[in-house]
From Swiss-Prot:
Residues 1-25, 80-100, 159-195, 260-272 are extracellular. The keyword Transmembrane applies. Residues 50-57, 121-139, 220-236, 293-328 are cytoplasmic. Its main location: membrane. This is Olfactory receptor 2AJ1. It comes from Homo sapiens. The keyword Plastid does not apply. The chain crosses the membrane at residues 26-49, 58-79, 101-120, 140-158, 196-219, 237-259, 273-292. Glycans are attached at N5. Keywords: Cell membrane, Disulfide bond, G-protein coupled receptor, Glycoprotein, Membrane, Olfaction, Receptor, Sensory transduction, Transducer, Transmembrane, Transmembrane helix. One of its GO terms (cellular component) is plasma membrane.
């Protein structure tokens, strides 16, 4: 019992990405700017979708949930990195580490399923446009988004509970910038082989199957696009599909490489580098790739900026008019 209490009460140490060198300071500032950009972009995306009825479609409904996941994802990791870097302390409590594991697995799993749902939405919209209003009704998109969250939470709860029950009786130093399961398993003095097999099974369900579904959907979309008579429409569709596949590959590729390798094949440098892609870079790129290049989103953004500008202008003129009335 004493050993078990020691396991649950001791803090972990996050070795992180940064040292005290000038290069690390620059790298830290770059990542912090990326974090601010990610939160700002995704928050703006949610506000735009919620505020204008033109964006109340299944595609943008799913995109709003993707933006919410991305905000939570970067906010789960980067603030702790910033705090540790500025304070010089690298500790994280057992409960804090458990929460990071739970939230990151929830969001990573949920986003994998949500990206697959979004590819299905695009497949139906482009390949079966006449059936789109029937197949993609409001409840269908709500079911896709809700299912992604719920399945992500369930998977995360199981893995978090299982991973944290291992005894950590050696070093408490996690050679990573956040509490990630593969990095934590290296600290366990118990045999984690069976659990690693479970991680591989989950990786097949949450990574390989959705990625295969996305690839198949975009493959069918490309075949449909090739049959279009308009060269401009073909060019636009190919451009959109290629950007989407780049982001999907940037997200799934490092994620698959991290979670489908045995513990013995993991190196701290590789794991940290790969994790930057699916925890920080992809959430920043998603709004640009999926939304800000879209004419509808740009039109709504322009209208919002115009209305805010006119509102400020009117607020300035009202006091002037009142003053003139008093003078008269």
């Amino acid at each position: 019992m004493g050993h078990q209490n020691h396991t649950f009460s001791s803090d972990f140490i996050l070795l992180g990405l940064f040292s005290s060198s000038p290069t690390s300071v620059v790298f830290f500032l770059v990542l912090f700017v990326i974090f601010i950009m990610s939160v700002t972009e995704n928050t703006l995306m949610i506000l735009l979708i919620r505020s204008d009825s033109r964006l109340h479609t299944p595609m943008y409904f799913l995109l709003s949930h993707l933006s919410l996941m991305d905000i939570l994802h970067v906010s789960n990791i980067v603030p702790k990195m910033v705090t540790n870097f500025l304070s010089g302390s690298r500790t994280i409590s057992f409960a804090g580490c458990g929460f990071q594991v739970f939230l990151s697995l929830t969001l990573l799993g949920g986003e994998c399923l949500l990206l697959a749902a979004m590819s299905c939405d695009r497949y139906v919209a482009i390949c079966h446009p006449l059936r789109y209003p029937i197949l993609m009704k409001e409840y269908a998109s709500a079911l896709m988004a809700g299912g992604s969250w719920l399945i992500g939470v369930f998977n995360s709860t199981v893995h978090t509970a299982y991973a944290l029950q291992f005894p950590f009786c050696g070093s408490r130093a996690i050679d990573h910038f956040f509490c990630e399961v593969p990095a934590m398993l290296k600290l366990s003095c118990a045999d984690t082989t069976r659990y690693e097999r479970g991680v591989c099974v989950s990786a097949v369900i949450f990574l390989l199957i959705p990625f295969s579904l996305i690839s198949a959907s975009y493959g069918q979309i490309i075949l449909t696009v090739l049959q279009m008579k308009s060269s401009e429409a073909r060019k636009k569709s190919f451009s959109t599909c290629s950007f989407h596949m780049i982001v999907v590959t940037m997200y799934y590729g490092p994620f698959i490489f991290t979670y489908m390798r045995p513990k013995s094949y993991h190196t701290p440098g590789q794991d940290k580098f790969l994790a930057i892609f699916y925890t920080i870079l992809t959430p920043t790129l998603n709004p640009f790739i999926y939304s800000f290049r879209n004419k509808d989103v740009l039109a709504v953004m322009k209208n919002m900026l115009k209305s805010n500008f006119l509102h400020k202008k009117m607020n300035r003129k009202i006091p002037e008019c009142v003053f003139c009335l008093f003078l008269c």
